Amino acid sequence: MAKKNMIQREIKREKLEKKYYLKRLAIKEQLKKTTSFAEKIELRQKLQEMPRNSAPVRSRNRCWLTGRSRGYYRDFGLSRHVFREMSHECLLPGVTKSSW
């Protein structure tokens, strides 16, 4: 189980991402369209003034049950440990153990 403060930090980052998403997108579009070097510097400065945690790069995928960040399966939103336990207990529909 991950520390509760780490889980809360990720939740805070997700909220900031959603809050600044449109603003960040608009600035990036302007940055692509402009050709003037001075304007590009100004727009990059605006991006840098935004909170760091509002950047989507800083968020980390975490298991929704335990908060574990490593061994994460995107399709299920679970870490490998929880995925294995739940699949053995038949709690994940359509998941079967392979054998050959």
From Swiss-Prot:
Gene3D superfamilies cross-referenced by the UniProt entry: 1.10.287.1480
InterPro entries for this protein: Ribosomal_uS14, Ribosomal_uS14_bac/plastid, Ribosomal_uS14_CS
Annotated localization: Plastid, Chloroplast
CC annotations in GO: chloroplast; small ribosomal subunit
Molecular function terms from GO: rRNA binding; structural constituent of ribosome
Family matches, as Pfam families: Ribosomal_S14
Tree of life domain: Eukaryota
Assembly information from the UniProt record: Part of the 30S ribosomal subunit.
HAMAP family, sorted: Ribosomal_uS14_1
Functional description taken from the UniProt entry: Binds 16S rRNA, required for the assembly of 30S particles.
Similarity comment: Belongs to the universal ribosomal protein uS14 family.
Record's protein name: Small ribosomal subunit protein uS14c
Gene: rps14
